[in-house]
Amino acid sequence: MKILFIFIYFSLINLLFSYDFEVEILSAGDERDTNIFKYSDTITYRHFNNTTNWKDNLGDWGKLQCAGNHTIIKNQGTILKNYCKGTNKDGDIFWLMMDRKSNDFDSGIGKIVYEKGTGKFEKYDGVQCVYAITFLPERDGSFIKSKCKFKDK
């Protein structure tokens, strides 16, 4: 019984010291930054570079530079791999990677992993987040919202 009490106690303490962190990313599309290669009737490959803006629910905001690719397979979905470098208003930097496998190019759910950071972002190393993306109807912009669970160190 004592062991169960200790386990519950430390589990509750762990929950108390974790908090949610949300990031919103807004982008405007520019076809000049996208290369499209139609591999076959069923596979289309898109490579892109873009710069977007982000803000979080902690009052921080900044710029995000990304490069990545989408592989769209007809009747099977899309696979995304995106690498980004973010800078906040104070000059702190973070690097993250976005992965998504979904049925639809225009919307889906994926994973963000913070690879490393400087300044305030040092403590985010290795943190994983879930994100959802929706593109505008003409695919000339998108909205991403991510939710992360951080632990204080």
Model-derived features with residue positions:
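Structural motif marking the loop-to-transmembrane transition
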Residues: M1-L4, D106
